[in-house]
Amino acid sequence: EQEILSKNPDQMVVVCCGKGNNGGDGFAIARHLANRNYRVTVVHAGEAKTEDAFKNQQIWEQFGESVSFPSSDASRIINSADILVDSIFGTGLERGIGGAYHEWIEIINDCKAASKWAVDIPSGVYSDDSRIRGQAVRCDFTVSMQFGKTGCFQFPGSSLSGIIFVSDISIPFHADCLKNPDNENHLGTWLSTPSFIKKLLPRRPLESHKGDFGHLFTVCGSSGMAGAAMLASM
């Protein structure tokens, strides 16, 4: 919500909500945006299936406009959006996208919204390994909760995630739900960024010579495959 507010003042927002907790987040986002005088409409998949999502859906329907998908109204509303928020599926997706959901995502991808935002991860991208489950939303921005999701940083999922923001929702690092079963002291996944790599490289005096830091001997492939050896030796 804060990321959308900072970039898109005074525009029409359409929030597409599924039946699970990701959809519940979408209803909450719609409510907060409406409270800040955005014009917001929710397109939803029907009655929410989880307790938290159902509560947020009930709150929204007391004062906000919503339509269910599939319907001609839903398609029209999606195509009228300036900003579209994808909150259909999140990290819990375990099946392929088919039927009405496949059609829904196609309409979202074809609409001419100025910007499309994913909540946590684009719908249809598998969070652990970035596979596409039949169909997936192409987003300009993704706002991941607390930690970036692996599926947003690997292909093909990364090509659909756009610019990625990570939003702190105050989950402590040592929480049980975040522990790696093989090593509870860390999460088990590291994202290579320029700042991360820079920390691994020792600071070298300006007057130093390459010979001051040892020698490297590389054993590589056949004589016709020298490219990798050259790159590794640079």
Where are these regions (language model features)?
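Internal gly/pro-rich beta-alpha loop/helix module
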Residues: D82-I83, I88-G90, E94-H186
